[in-house]
Amino acid sequence: MHTPPEHSSISDGYSLSLGGLYWPRPYFPSRTERAALIGQSLPHWAIPTGNTAGWIWTGMGLPTPLTVLRPSTPALSPLEREHWRAREVRDSRHTVVDVAGQSILDPLSTEIELLSHGRDIDSAATQILFLRTLRELEGHPIATRMSPSQRERAHAVLQRVRELAERYPDITR
């Protein structure tokens, strides 16, 4: 929820509301600005993943609900773990990079997270479309480590990516 001055600024067109996050400028933020904006909204230990990381990389979809991973050490309190619903970073699956001082999953790890977790298939498909071409995604070895439900979701997302690529060939690479 925005404060009254923020709401007034948004209404007057001097700032933006990006999925509930306040951006104090009238233009859409660049990648480094998106990373900094998300960094202000997260605890210091949080690593954006899924739709949040996809939004930082592509600017497509919404960054909310904020999805994060947590480091193995130091361990978080059970209350904090429950509040953020943060899964643990796995070195075998996740590659973390730095964007404007914010740790974030790299594009390939973000794609795998979008394929296997989350709720919104359309948003995931759009973010994946801008992250990588479909040809590079299919048959990725990490896909073999997915559970049956994650694999089913991945197939639904990839089908939506194919539909988007056919419907909007001018935006595909």
Residue ranges and their predicted role:
Residues 1-150, 159-173:
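Short gly/ser-rich loop at a beta-strand->alpha-helix junction or flexible surface loop bordering the NTP-binding
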